Each structure stands twice: as C-alpha cells, then as structure tokens.
C-alpha cells in the first residue's frame, strides 16, 4: 500500500510534473529488471544515437533496449532544444529550426529519417509484399523516398518556425520523446513482416505490459512542461499510429525496422502540427 502526499502547489504544470514523477518512481521501484536498467539504456544509446557510450555492452540484450526509446528522445530532444535556443539568439527562427533538425539527424545518424524514406520508396513503388520488402532493403533512395523526406522536413521547419519562439525548445523535447512511443506500440501489436527470411528477425521483441506502461510514462512526461491545452495533441499521434499499423499490416502483414522509423517520423511531425493547431485557442 502507498499513498500520494498532498501537493502544495496550485501550478497545473507543477501538479502534472509531480504526478508523472510519482508514477515513474513507482514503476521503476517495481521493475523486475531493475538491476539491468543501466545496461539496457546504454545499449539503446549505442544503437539509436551516435553519442559516446561504454564499449563493454552485451548486444544480445539489444532488442529489449527499445523500451528506452522515449528516454533517448529526452536526450536527443534536449540537445536539439539547446541548439535551437542558441541559434535563435543569432539568426531567424526558421534558421534555428533547420539547425535543430540537423542536430537531430546528426545525433541519430538519420536512422529514423532513413526508415521513412525507405517506406516511401517501398510502399510507393511496390505492388506486392515481396516487392515492397525488396525495395525497402535496397540502400539506395528513390524518387518517392526523396520527395517524401523533403516534404516531411519542410513541414517540420514551417511548423516550428511559426510557433512562439520561447515554446519551441519544450515542444522539441516533447516531440522527440512522444514520437518514440509509436514504434513500441507497433512492435507489441504486430509481427515482424520478414518472418524467418531475414537475419534481422532475431532482433524482434514484443514489449510486455509493464514495459509499455514504463515507456508511456517516460514518453508523456515532457507534456507536463507545456500548456495544459497541449495534452490532446497525443490523440492525433495515436490515431496516426493506428492508421500506420493497419496500413503496414494490410500491405506486408506486419512491420519492419523501416516501418518503425517511419512511424517515429510521422508521429513527431503530427505532434508538432497538433500542438501548433491547439495553441491557436490559447
């Protein structure tokens, strides 16, 4: 049994922050893998970013490290936010937004953007499952991928450039964190589309309920820093995830790593668009 101490503040953002922190503490304290958390986090850091990490890691546990994707989003989003803040002191907001996006791509090695481009190529040019998977496996980018990636980046830049300047850093942190939850939801709901025909199938992992709750809390925590009206922005993100999951399942019977990367990019962009639209009413 436990009880929640009385919150002695009238600030809505503070209340939300303390509530999420309390829930996170409870989840962490009950995690059966508690002693392994540091190892999994550094595995996630090594795979999903280009940031320095310990060299002595057990990569057999790499699939389970996906649970820490939202926490990686805190890190990449925080660095992008810092880049935006510093760049905005010297240049126009649109330039600062571009530099923040460049920072994000450099931090992750363009991992998710590459997945999005491959999905555009595969689903744009493939007429059946086999052909779609073949195209996505090709390392070369095609017309669909190039156009899709270009339009996606332009959309992000235009939305971030139109937001209130002081709010963009927090939106970047929230966007990077929340957008890394959809890949986990797809992994839990659907099967790996390549089956046993790919060496990558050994990296397939289905998060359990507790891991999903943990990842969800981590992903949503940054929302506590934004105005209360921003909370509904998570709904379009979830709807987009449901749509993508159904679309992937209908076309190829599940997901691939590229599909997961694409879901992150779509979710991030949808979140920015949703927050921007909601703030019209503030």
Short names for language-model regions:
Residues 1-16, 22-36:
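Short, low-complexity, charge-dense intrinsically disordered segments
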Residues 114, 124-125:
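Glycine/small-residue-rich loop that forms an oxyanion/phosphate-binding "nest" at active or ligand-binding sites
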Residues 24-28, 34-109, 127, 138-282:
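Hydrophobic alpha-helical transmembrane segments
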Residues 125-131:
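Juxtamembrane helix-boundary/capping and inter-helix hinge elements in multi-pass membrane proteins
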